[in-house]
């Protein structure tokens, strides 16, 4: 018995690449949001969990290279995994504070 040929009726959709953008604040721009800076300085773990929750991720990865890389690629922010590794290694508090400030600003612009 002959089999009928398989016909594909759906085509792959168009995926829009994220447009290039930059960080909303610099790495050491603590005074643009003192609340985030104080939270990161005195309760680093809490801020990391807030960032992870904002991104719908596990709270254990809020301060990792993977979280920063995911965020950077999601919003088309230039950089590399090596850059992300160096920032999170040598300045973890500044890294998480920058992520939180960026999330807050993008949320205020309805872009998060």
Swiss-Prot record:
Name assigned to this protein: Placenta-specific gene 8 protein
Family designation: Belongs to the cornifelin family.
Name of the gene this protein is made from: Plac8
A Gene Ontology BP annotation from the UniProt entry: transcription by RNA polymerase II
MF-aspect GO terms: chromatin binding
Any Gene Ontology CC annotation: nucleus
PANTHER family documented for this protein: DUF614 FAMILY PROTEIN-RELATED
InterPro entries: PLAC_motif_containing (IPR006461)
